[in-house]
Amino acid sequence: MNIKNLRRLYNIIHTFLRYGIDEVIPDIPLTRGIRCGRKSLFWVKNQYPNEPFGVRLRLALQELGPVWIKLGQMLSTRRDLFEPELADQLALLQDSVEAFDGKLARRLIEEALGDKLEKWFDDFDETALASASIAQVHIAKFNQNQPLAGKEVVLKVLRPEIERVIKDDLALMYRLASWIPRLNKEGRRLRPVEVVREYEKTLLDELDLRKEMVNAIRLRNNFENSEMLYVPEMYQEFCHKNVIVMERIYGIPVANIDELKANGTDMKLLAERGVQVFFTQVFRDSFFHADMHPGNIFVNPNHPENPQYIGIDCGIVGTLNQNDKRYLAESFVAFFNRDYRRVALMHVESGWTPADTDIDAFEEAFREVCEPIFAKPLSEISFGHVLLNLFTVARKFNMEVQPQLVLLQKTLLYIEGLGRQVYPQLDLWQTAKPFLQDWLNEQVGFKAMWRDLKQRAPQFREHFAEFPEAMFQALQQQKQINFRLNEINQSLKAQRNNTGFSRLMILGIAIAGTFWKFEMLPLWVSVPLLVIEFRILIWCMSFSNNSYS
């Protein structure tokens, strides 16, 4: 660690101490040396003793800067780890920082594009339209030399030196995270190193704007010609690692309820479409925008009777596999049916909790946490909080962290919050139920079986030519096993007093042959032979019994 990093580490610790964050260090013999060092090296007291811990932590992170602000924002979504009061305070962190110089932004963009801006654009505004911790945006329009002459665009450019700043602070975060489990028993449950690793992946992805471009193009294609969602066009020839250029959009911020109502927006349909957009992304596309906070969502002011969302900033996305979607759909349906045993089994069958989990205890834990939720009408139940409760219980039974589901739960809370802000009477269950039922109907039952058979047909056809040889090998092996069984039976006639041992020997040889075939032969060969073996086994046991009678 160099002098610069040491100075930064000192500043971080000093800031945490000024806000009294060290109160989480327990007063036990193990931490005595740390507490003595704290008093010797840092002559600073908690300057906000009357503020709750959550408020002090939020203020400390805000003061430490962009990287720590975004960490706090991410932690605010991990309500399976933190108390609601603390998570609520972290959610108040604002990723809004002063813009860097517009002339520097121009120079960075020109370096990325390889020429002066005037070659492609007119009216570049050096005053940033918006500025955040990672990047800021400027507006311009295509000049007369371009096919889209006069089209307004937004140019997004990374902050200078941001990658170095982030990597330096991440290294310090890892160091601090490694200390937490040693200082506090509760810290081990939080798995701080794992949390920082998850945060690092998300943050480093945001440092390559080309990934945002790819995500936006994919989302735009998924909702092409959709009345529900519009995603601005990306101009790929102008997109680079630190600069992207996209279509400029005009819309009403989704949080501006008064303006939406003044525009005559159908608020009920708007709220329902928010839920529909989310579940369409999850169950149809397996790909969802995972940063759908109010600052990234607008409403098209045209056709307010048929409202359309506009989504921007696709830097953070989530993807789901079939196992994830099955877990979600079946867990939600089982929850609303109050089938907590099925919920418990889903976690084990998914491989997310250990196979030796006590299902009875797991079921009862879900019942204790989830049953009180039904004190509310179904229409008022939050899917996001249902998932949160499931995760909270599952973590106590050693569920592995599933980052894609954490992202999904965070996004679901955003969508639900916005939906009920737009239309307080929104019935989430009735809006989401068709998506869950349609997906489950598509995935289980005869249709799903027939689809799987059709998909596997080329594989069956490819291996069909191998059938005669495989069958010949299997029969040869079966002859050897039968011969050995006959030898054993002859030998057992001389051991009539050891009936238990003899039967076990017969059973063992048969089972060994069975396992060999399942491991070495195609399924369509080994299954018929398994039937033959069981008949031989029954015959052997019968023969053995007759010998002893």
From Swiss-Prot:
Which one Pfam family would you cite for this protein?
ABC1
Alphabetical keyword list = ATP-binding, Cell inner membrane, Cell membrane, Kinase, Membrane, Nucleotide-binding, Transferase, Transmembrane, Transmembrane helix, Ubiquinone biosynthesis
**Entry keyword Transport:** no
Q: Which InterPro entries match?
A: ABC1_dom, Kinase-like_dom_sf, UbiB, UbiB_bact, UbiB_kinase
Q: Which domain of life is it from?
A: Bacteria
- Give binding positions for ATP: 129-137, 156
Q: Its pathway?
A: Cofactor biosynthesis; ubiquinone biosynthesis [regulation]
Q: Where does the record place the catalytic residues?
A: 291 (proton acceptor)
PANTHER family, A to Z: CHAPERONE-ACTIVITY OF BC1 COMPLEX CABC1 -RELATED, PROTEIN ACTIVITY OF BC1 COMPLEX KINASE 7, CHLOROPLASTIC
Family classification: Belongs to the ABC1 family. UbiB subfamily.
Q: What is this protein called?
A: Probable protein kinase UbiB
Q: Which organism is it from?
A: Glaesserella parasuis serovar 5 (strain SH0165)
* Classification lineage: Bacteria, Pseudomonadati, Pseudomonadota, Gammaproteobacteria, Pasteurellales
Q: Which gene encodes it?
A: ubiB
